[in-house]
């Protein structure tokens, strides 16, 4: 086998490793394993992800480009901080983009879109309908299914840039939501709330679906302010 052929086969494998590391690092930042403001030391990251510095630097540079990580002059990388002002900025923009996307999806959505909304809701409901203790045990699974459901709702909006910006803001909002999740008491499930959004979308009631999404996002903002003020408004 020629060196060129070996290189061609190795390149996709290297890309898969880089993407896997990026996904894991992002998930660990969102989940709080690396809290806001934490230094990201290469030695510790190499031990955690079992990859070289080049792969880590590539992943960290990408996360810096989307605002999840910051570059400290002469000190490497650190997790981006959080603040009340940033929460307000992220949430207000996300609400705007989410509402625009759901309205366009409802207008443009076809049978395949309807089926994806129903399927992702069904999977989400499979956890949200369970007892509180089981929901807590399956929280990480719920996070992924919740993301899938909300993506399905807006997936037919017809604008890749709107979807891209919405996904970026959603990740930042998820970090705030998970901060509050770790500090607030386990409440009732949100099955009825998600069912109402699903029903409004499938019935093509755009204004109602958009308002329900706004209320859900505002609920998240209120919970962050109530249960995680020490992160967004640290004492001076």
Give the label of every model feature segment:
Residues 111-178, 190-199, 208-219:
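Conserved amphipathic alpha-helical segments that form helical-bundle/coiled-coil interaction surfaces
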Residues 14, 79, 94, 142, ...:
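Residue-level marker of regulatory loop/turn positions in helix-turn-helix DNA-binding domains and
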Residues 2, 24, 48, 182-236:
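C-terminal regulatory/effector modules of DNA-binding transcriptional regulators
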Residues 15-18, 110, 135, 139, ...:
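Flexible, glycine- and charge-enriched loops at secondary-structure boundaries
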Residues 1-107, 221, 225-236:
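Short linear motifs at protein or domain termini
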Residues 106-107, 158, 182:
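Short helix-capping/hinge motifs at transmembrane helix termini and TM-loop junctions
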Residues 83-84, 177-180:
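Short alpha-helical transmembrane interface motifs in multi-pass membrane proteins
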């Amino acid at each position: 086998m020629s060196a060129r052929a070996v290189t061609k086969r190795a390149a996709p494998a290297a890309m898969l490793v880089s993407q896997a590391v990026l996904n894991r690092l992002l998930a660990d930042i969102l989940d709080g394993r690396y809290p806001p403001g934490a230094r990201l030391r290469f030695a510790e990251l190499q031990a955690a992800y079992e990859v070289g510095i080049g792969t880590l630097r590539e992943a960290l540079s990408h996360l810096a480009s989307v605002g999840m990580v910051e570059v400290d002059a002469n000190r490497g990388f650190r997790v981006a901080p959080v603040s009340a002002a940033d929460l307000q900025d992220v949430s207000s923009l996300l609400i705007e983009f989410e509402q625009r996307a759901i309205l366009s999806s409802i207008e443009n959505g076809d049978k395949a879109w309807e089926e994806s909304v129903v399927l992702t809701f069904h999977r989400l409901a499979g956890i949200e309908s369970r007892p509180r203790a089981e929901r807590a045990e399956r929280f990480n699974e719920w996070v992924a299914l919740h993301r899938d459901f909300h993506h399905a709702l807006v997936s037919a909006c017809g604008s890749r840039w709107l979807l891209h910006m919405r996904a970026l803001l959603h990740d930042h909002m998820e970090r705030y939501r998970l901060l509050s999740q770790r500090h607030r008491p386990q409440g009732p499930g949100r099955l009825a709330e998600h069912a109402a959004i699903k029903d409004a979308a499938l019935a093509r009631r755009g204004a109602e679906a958009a308002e329900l999404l706004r209320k859900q996002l505002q609920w998240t903002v209120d919970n962050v302010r109530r249960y995680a003020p020490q992160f967004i408004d640290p004492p001076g």
